[in-house]
Amino acid sequence: MATKFQKDLQKYAELAVRVGLNLRPGQRLLVRAPSPYGVAFEHAALIHYISEAAYKAGARYVDVIWGDEQTELIRFAHAPRDSFAEFPHWKLTAPLEYAERGDAILTIAATDPDLLAGQDPDLVNTYQETVWKVMNPYLVHGTSNTMNWCVISAARPGWAKKMFPKPDEEKAVANLWKTIFQMCRVDQADPIAA
């Protein structure tokens, strides 16, 4: 039997797909993160509910760009400095293809806010400038509304502890999920109608 959290997470996914994206039958769906790291593996349950909701709404195909922030930290610690002016173009290809086809893109904004704290600011700046330069052809589609797109959030320990510093990490994450669900009316009997 599903827990209350699992039921709320499922309603959140359905809300994102049906209302946020207004996914149409036959569209493909790409789920990604706003950062180049990809969607954190810890959000697999949410991704599963999103995929199910998308297919039930008539999605032709659902794809996810997964990632691992710790791998990026390892890069900052050990990669050659001149490598930060490089960015793999395949990370542009997928979202650009979806955007050009008029498909749907769901972005899960849940990056650790302190991930790059303590890193060389010049490297961070070079890295961010490179990412924005490469990703610009895709970003233009979002600002010109040529595709269905939506940004949602998901609770992560870093953000949870910033918003709820007093309780332990697990309780802070639970509080952040509760807040996200309340803000999106997931706590209502019918969040889609709310």
Spans of model-derived segments:
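Active-site bordering "gate/hinge" segments
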Residues: 1-194
